[in-house]
Structure formats: C-alpha cells, structure tokens
From Swiss-Prot:
Catalytic activity, EC: 7.2.2.7
InterPro entries from the UniProt entry: AAA+_ATPase, ABC_SmlMolc_Importer, ABC_transporter-like_ATP-bd, ABC_transporter-like_CS, ABC_transpr_FbpC, Mo/tungstate-bd_C_term_dom, P-loop_NTPase, Transp-assoc_OB_typ2
Location in or out of the cell: Cell membrane
Species whose genome carries this gene: Rhodococcus jostii (strain RHA1)
Keyword Iron: yes
Residues the entry annotates as binding ATP: G37, P38, S39, G40, C41, G42, K43, T44
Family membership noted in the UniProt record: Belongs to the ABC transporter superfamily. Fe(3+) ion importer (TC 3.A.1.10) family.
Protein name: Fe(3+) ions import ATP-binding protein FbpC 1
C-alpha cells in the first residue's frame, strides 16, 4: 500500500534539546489524523518537518511514496501540502480575495475561482472585498483554509487552527472545516492539545508525549483502551485505582469489576471512565459518601469517597452524571461499574 504520508524514525533537536525521538507512523490517503499532546511535546515541530519548513536530523518522510526528507530533500514549495497556522497568517492589509488568490498561479487568480474557493469554505463571495480585520476569528480561519485549498494539495496540515476561537465558534468552525476537507477527499493532519477536538475530528488519533508517539488508534480505541495510565489520564477524565487482577476480574475499591483481557495479572492498577460508574437507586453495590458536586451545565461531576472494607485505603472517585441531581455533600450513595475496566501493571 502507498500511504499519503510515511514518517519513519524521525529525530529532531534544537540547541541540544531533543524535541522528537524515533517518531514513526503512516497516514492512509483520504483519512484524517489528529496528533494530540500537551504543549511542548513536539507536535508542531513534527508538522513543520512534514511541511518542509524544517529538516529532520534523522529518519525519513515520504509523501505518496516519494521521499521528501532524509535520503532526499524537497523544499516546502515542492511538496503538495497545504498548511493552516494557528493564527491563520493572513496578510492584514490585503483583501480576502487577494489572500485567497495568493495560493493560486497568477493566471488562475480570477474572481470566479476566488468566489469558488470562498464558497467551498461556506463564505459568501462578497467577502472577497473585505479585509481580515472585518471578519470574525472563525471566518479568518476559513479564509486561510480557502487559500491553502487553492493549491489543490494532496495533504492538508492544520496547526491548532481553532485554539484561539471561543468555544461556540470553535465547534462550528471545526465542523465546517471537517466537512470541507471530507468533501474534497484531502488527507488531513490536525495538531491540537484539545482532547475532545482530536477525538471528534479525526478517523485516527496519535497521542504524543515527550517527543514520542505513545499510541495511535481510532478515537474509540484511544479513549476506551489507552495503552498506559499517563495516556488514559491525558486523553480524558480517568478513575485509576490499585487492584488485584485474577483472570477476567479485578478486586479494587470499586468492588469486584470485569477487566478487558490484556495479559495483566496480579497486583495492578485499573482504569475506568467516570461515565462507567453508576449510582444505584437502592444503594446496592459499593457504598460511598458524596464529598463535592461540580455543576457543568448539561452534566455534573460528583466526587465520592468510597467506604472501603477489607482494610483497603479509602479512595475518592469521580462520577459523571447527566442532568440535574439532588445529591449534596454528605449524602450516602451506592455505586457500581458498568462495562469493563482496563488493567495496567502496578
């Protein structure tokens, strides 16, 4: 299979500081991949290497089977790659039309082609006469996308393009951009530090930590079966408890719970998501005491201190509950675990 992008054993350092170490992954044509990780983990550096703005110290990068870095070098303008930066990088004193047209060959910079590109990103062609400061942040990012699309790239790179937008505008702009790229069937890589954004935007998610890729998989795999505890805790709220695993069951502060088969036995740590913990209407299951209630609008997070037995140290867990609740700190509740926990070596 020829992949749209292949990265193999890539290292990169700046001033003696190692930023990327042995990064390797492949991206299928027409797919969307999100690279998610905390600030400073190396994800933007990786994107710049793919774009051709920097050279790797070791390893190779290939686009559609053609090596463009390591064993050969193709500068950015020789790669069929579109790039949208975090701030859009529009020319502030040029019109929207001129900004979009910058991505086109001179002979193709016609009003009709610019109008077509604006319509692709759900902007009225009349916006061509405006300047960037007359647009909202979301509209500016869509203009930046239109400019990148003008080159008809085989690969689109998005470097945290929604991070500067407020929550409502960010979600709407993200949906529009995802729809545009899907209709154009352009292979896309999104870099973000926003976990829900990565999970909702992409077909596959790559979790980056300290210059390495910790795990690559579908959004469901990354969220439901993270490879280790740090990945579990980074990608979403996680309840992690000490446990003893025997076959397909684990004994922990949440009681006797089912675990996904992954070869872990004996002393271990188990992870469940807050939404897997259910309050029992009759108080059955493990008992606990509500210690705090966090209101988040459509959902609530309940902090519950478990009333453990068998000499186990009391544990505090978080329970996600949708809708309103009458529970207050001090109330006693019963809880049980739905589905399977994931076990990790102690």
């Amino acid at each position: 299979m020829t992949y749209a992008l292949e990265v193999d054993g890539v290292d990169k350092s700046f001033g003696g500081a190692t930023i990327l170490r042995g990064v390797a992954f492949a991206v299928e044509s027409g797919s969307t991949t999100a690279i998610v990780g905390p600030s400073g983990c190396g994800k933007t550096t990786l994107l710049r290497l793919i774009a051709g703005f920097e050279k790797p110290d070791a390893g190779t990068i290939a686009l559609a089977g053609r090596v463009v870095a390591g064993g050969g070098w193709a500068p950015a303008h020789r790669r069929s790659v579109g790039y949208v930066a975090q701030d859009g990088a529009l020319f502030p004193h040029a019109t929207v039309g001129a900004n979009v047209g910058f991505g086109l060959p001179r002979r193709a910079r016609t009003p009709a082609r610019i109008a077509e590109l604006l319509e692709m990103v759900s902007l009225d062609p009349s916006y061509a006469a405006r300047r960037p400061d007359q647009l909202s942040g979301g509209q500016q990012q869509r203009v930046a996308l239109a400019r990148a699309l003008a080159r008809e790239p085989e690969l689109m790179l998005l470097d945290e393009p929604f991070s500067a937008l407020d929550a409502g505008l960010r979600a709407n702009t993200r949906r529009i951009v995802a729809d545009v790229l899907a209709k154009a069937a352009i292979t896309t890589i999104l870099v973000t530090h926003d976990q829900p954004e990565a999970l909702s935007f992409a077909d596959r998610v790559a979790v980056m930590r300290a210059g390495r890729l910790a795990q690559i998989g579908t959004p469901r795999e990354i969220y439901s079966t993270p490879i280790d505890v740090p990945t579990a805790e980074f990608i979403g709220d996680a309840v992690v408890l000490s446990a003893h695993v025997d076959g397909s069951r684990a004994r922990c502060a949440l009681g006797d719970v089912a675990v996904a088969a992954n070869g872990v036995h004996g002393n271990a740590r188990v992870m469940v998501r807050p939404e897997q913990i259910e309050l029992t209407p009759d108080g059955a299951g493990v008992s606990g005491t509500v210690v705090d209630v966090e209101y988040l609008g459509s959902e609530m997070l309940l902090g519950i201190r478990l009333n453990t037995a068998d000499g186990m140290v009391p544990e505090r867990v978080t329970v996600r509950r949708f809708g309103a609740t009458t529970l207050t700190p001090g109330d006693r509740v019963g809880i049980r675990v739905l589905g399977k926990a994931v076990a990790y070596p102690a």
